[in-house]
């Protein structure tokens, strides 16, 4: 009530906005100074170029005046750069302080939320709830064991020794069948191996003729190669 009458609420709102406004204004002014800095550097370069031109023309008076302007602009540039450095430091400090403030506010809100959550809890209630959960878990395990228990009784159980004997008999039968297959295959293959197949002889005259034709072809190719070489040498001598 009293705070609203004396305007404390509005002042608190203004205090919250003041850091942000200060940061914005500082950044704007730093940008303005940065533009001024670039302009002054351009003027310094121009004055130096004018001094060089006047010297080449032999006009030392005008060259000296250009250098004086350059010195004046350099002094102004130094002041602008110093102001920029101070404002950048101030901006960094305000941003850091504002970040700390916002962090503190967030942590306070988190603490309030945790307090609200824990207001309806105490250690006794937690222990009681955990005991109930453990009981239900144990009950669930017992139910799972009961459901997964086999329904076969002792009267329906199979003799393991009897199963082993039957398995050995099946293995012996398989071995006998494989042996009989091997014997039958050997018996059927024996007559075929005894028969000899005679093949006709191959004439050798055609082979000799083909060899001679190949040699003749190679000799003709060698002669053609020599002719081509001679022709190329003649063309080279004639400059063709």
UniProtKB/Swiss-Prot annotation:
One of its GO terms (cellular component) is ESCRT III complex. Residues 229-240 have a biased composition (Basic and acidic residues). Residues 195-212 have a biased composition (Polar residues). Transmembrane segments: none annotated. Residues 193-240 are annotated as: Disordered. GO terms for biological process: ATP export; intralumenal vesicle formation; late endosome to vacuole transport; late endosome to vacuole transport via multivesicular body sorting pathway; peroxisome organization; protein transport; reticulophagy; ubiquitin-dependent protein catabolic process via the multivesicular body sorting pathway. Changing residue 121 to D: Leads to severe sorting defects. Residues 217-228 have a biased composition (Acidic residues). There is a cross-link at residue 229 (Glycyl lysine isopeptide (Lys-Gly) (interchain with G-Cter in ubiquitin)). InterPro entries: Snf7_fam. The keyword Cytoplasm applies. It comes from the Eukaryota. Present with 3270 molecules/cell in log phase SD medium. Belongs to the SNF7 family. Acts a component of the ESCRT-III complex required for the sorting and concentration of proteins resulting in the entry of these proteins into the invaginating vesicles of the multivesicular body (MVB). The sequential action of ESCRT-0, -I, and -II together with the ordered assembly of ESCRT-III links membrane invagination to cargo sorting. Membrane scission in the neck of the growing vesicle releases mature, cargo-laden ILVs into the lumen. This is Vacuolar-sorting protein SNF7. The lineage of its organism: Eukaryota, Fungi, Dikarya, Ascomycota, Saccharomycotina.
């Amino acid at each position: 009530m009293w705070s609203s009458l004396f305007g404390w609420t509005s002042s608190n709102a203004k205090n919250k906005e003041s850091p942000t406004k200060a940061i914005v204004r500082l950044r704007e002014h730093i940008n303005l100074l940065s533009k001024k800095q670039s302009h002054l550097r351009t003027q310094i370069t121009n004055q130096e170029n004018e001094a060089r031109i006047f010297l080449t023309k032999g006009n030392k008076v005008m060259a000296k005046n250009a250098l004086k302007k350059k010195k004046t602009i350099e002094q102004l540039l130094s002041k602008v750069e110093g102001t920029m450095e101070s404002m950048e430091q101030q901006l960094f400090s305000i941003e850091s302080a504002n970040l700390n403030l916002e962090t503190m506010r967030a942590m306070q809100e988190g603490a309030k939320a945790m307090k609200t959550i824990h207001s309806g809890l105490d250690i006794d209630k937690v222990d009681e709830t955990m005991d109930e959960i453990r009981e239900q878990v144990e009950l669930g395990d017992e139910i799972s064991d009961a459901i997964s228990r086999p329904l076969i009784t002792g009267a329906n159980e199979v003799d393991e020794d009897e199963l082993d004997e039957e398995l050995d008999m099946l293995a012996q039968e398989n071995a006998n069948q494989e042996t009989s297959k091997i014997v039958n295959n050997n018996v059927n293959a024996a007559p075929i191996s005894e028969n000899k197949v005679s093949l006709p002889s191959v004439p050798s005259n055609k082979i000799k003729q083909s060899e001679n034709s190949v040699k003749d072809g190679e000799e003709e190719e060698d002669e053609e190669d020599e002719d081509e070489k001679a022709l190329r040498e003649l063309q080279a001598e004639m400059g063709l």
